[in-house]
Amino acid sequence: MKVFRIGVIFSAFLLLIGIYVEAKNKPLNVVLIICDDLNRLGSGVDEEKYISDIKTPNIDKFAKHSSVFTRAYANIALCSPSRASLFTGVSPVHSQFLSNAVWWKNPILSEAGTIMDVFRASGYQVIGTGKIMHHFRPREWDEYGFQEDYGPMPWDGKSRVAHKSIPKPFCDEGPIGGSFGPIDRSENSKLEYEWVCRSSGVNQPFIYESNKERDKTPDEKNALWAKNKLKELGGKKKEPFFMAVGFVRPHTPLHVPSHWFDLYDFDSLSLPTFLDEDSADTFLAKQFEYIPKGFYRYRQLISSYNSKDEALRAWIHAYLASVSAVDECIGIVIDALKSEGLWDDTIIIVTSDHGYQLGQKDFLFKNALWEESMRIPLLIRVPNLSKENMYIDSPVSLIDIFPTLVDICELKYDQKVNIIRAGSSLKDLIDPSVRDELNRKAIGVVNSDKLDNSEEFIERQHWTIRTDRWRYIRYSNGSEELYDHDKDPNEWNNLALLQNYKAALNMISEELNKALQK
């Protein structure tokens, strides 16, 4: 009997060892959640919430279990090139892809391939839904839910329009750029429907009678699709998977159900601290023969209301409502990972393609080189590596996600000799036993509209570099901006022309030169 008991114990021990080894060697799944135009208000860090009453309970909850990068940046603050660099690992410096053109028609990006290709070659199932790349290409995916859809948008019976509540001239910006406000239903309307969604170039009715009797928004559909897919994957637990989930809010038009607007009292809403004539010592507007969109939209918005305060309050109210709406969608996906037993087997990333200026620098858009355009939320949870309440202040950027996933998931891929992949793995920052934070920098670019001569590409564009202390901006005509974030986190004072900052200016300028030559 004693021998029998020893045998049973030994067998159980071997079984436990086998389970441990299998679990240790099992590849981690990956779920990457990417929002559109979500600035650092979605970082999950209270200190970064310059609008104090922003409500993002799901992001905040996830942040407590994640590695939170408090200085994370886009490499270009425009949708298509930002996403292209993220998913290919090729910097705009090397691809020279700076516009919203079709990314795979760029010869360098087409040859480079994507992180989806790398995961598939490593035996992963590759799944997606929503807005991932700016232009959808079916061959990137084994299975896909819904393509990008910026709806719902107001419908007048013939075409998409700006919402009827938006005054002129801002409403002239159209149904996407010039529209915001709660989804509603007009009294005594004779239209069968007053809202449409638009996917693959086709208008589709969006039915809304009340908050309880309505269609799901595109973001809600994508969240529920991901939830159902995770339930299916949790039941199989066979091959590992890479899932990307793309949400469009808070991209314009800023339309979400009214209960999200009700979270914020319009009259008592806290606003960022604005500086009058904030753009006076900057040089972006002087680089173009036309008024850049951000400056133009800002002027249109302000001139449409009785005061600047009223105008910005209306816009920011809609932006915050949209952020809270997408926060719920993020929570649906993360909660599904927990309920389906995938939480401890899955790397989770929450981020955005770039930030957004909410009126800072007299600018209402993205595609600028200042902090609010470039800065993004970046939260990463790696099972058995990330620790709770970990905040990492080292400057990093979206280009670092590709090498991070390759490193942590131990992926193998064919590194083509003529393809330069930039970025550095963040694993040593996530691992608290290492925490290598030394000398990291984030590089960003804005298209100067001068793309006709590839040999002079770098000289013809506008560049920025962000270190732990400084932001330096250099425009193609040689104009410069320098901001000391230790003393001026709002970037209100351009120090580039001050003699006593000449040494700092020369130092950081040389850092940018070195980065652009790599």
Report each predicted region and the residues it spans.
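Bacterial N-terminal signal peptides that target proteins for export
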Residues: 1-9
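Bacterial N-terminal signal peptides
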Residues: 8-16
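Formylglycine-dependent sulfatase
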Residues: 21-471, 480, 491-493, 497-510
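Functionally engaged cysteine thiol sites
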Residues: 79, 515-518
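Short beta-strand micro-motifs enriched in acidic
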Residues: 473-475
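Intrinsically disordered, low-complexity polar regions and short flexible loop motifs
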Residues: 488
